[in-house]
Amino acid sequence: MGGGERFNIPGQHRNNLGKQIARQKLFDRNNQKMSMSHTKDRSRGCGTSLAWQAMQNGVNNNTLSSNQNWSAGFPASNNLFTNQDNQNYAGAKFSEPPSPSVLPKPPSHWVLLSCSPAEKELMSFQLKTLLKVQA
């Protein structure tokens, strides 16, 4: 028999359960420390900024939107995420297959050095059919 087999031993379950509870308590304590440190950091560094004070005081953002000089430089928020068909996208069009001249050459150790032109042509044909490239 191999050494990798495991059997259900009823006594071990209790030990594992205690370890799991101890781990969970440690995890909870660490999370509480993390959340406490975040609140301390806010009160020290970020609390001095005007924006942070405005958020804490519950100041309404209508004052910013009513300022015409400030909002005139920005387009309306609904125009930011709309699909603009008149712009040219410089990326690849995935519906079109790449041209054979753009495809990378295989490394030299993959290809035999003494290939006849017929064998090279056959390999390129097979690669093109695998990649579904129309030559």
UniProtKB/Swiss-Prot annotation:
Protein localization: Nucleus; Cytoplasm, P-body
Which of UniProt's keywords are assigned here? Answer: Activator, Cytoplasm, Nonsense-mediated mRNA decay, Nucleus, Transcription, Transcription regulation
Which spans does this entry mark as compositional bias, Polar residues? 75-89
What GO terms in the biological process aspect are recorded for it?
nuclear-transcribed mRNA catabolic process, nonsense-mediated decay
Question: Sorted alphabetically, which InterPro entries does this protein's record hold?
Answer: PNRC-like_rgn, PNRC1/2
Its cellular-component GO annotations read:
nucleus; P-body
* Start and end residues of each stretch annotated as Disordered: 75-103
In terms of superkingdom, the source organism counts as: Eukaryota
Principal localization?
Answer: nucleus
For this chain the motif SH3-binding maps to 95-101
Q: Which family does it belong to?
A: Belongs to the PNRC family. PNRC2 subfamily.
According to its UniProt entry, the function of this protein is described as: Involved in nonsense-mediated mRNA decay (NMD) by acting as a bridge between the mRNA decapping complex and the NMD machinery. May act by targeting the NMD machinery to the P-body and recruiting the decapping machinery to aberrant mRNAs. Required for upf1/rent1 localization to the P-body. Also acts as a nuclear receptor coactivator.
Q: Which PANTHER family match?
A: PROLINE-RICH NUCLEAR RECEPTOR COACTIVATOR
Name of the protein this chain belongs to = Proline-rich nuclear receptor coactivator 2 B
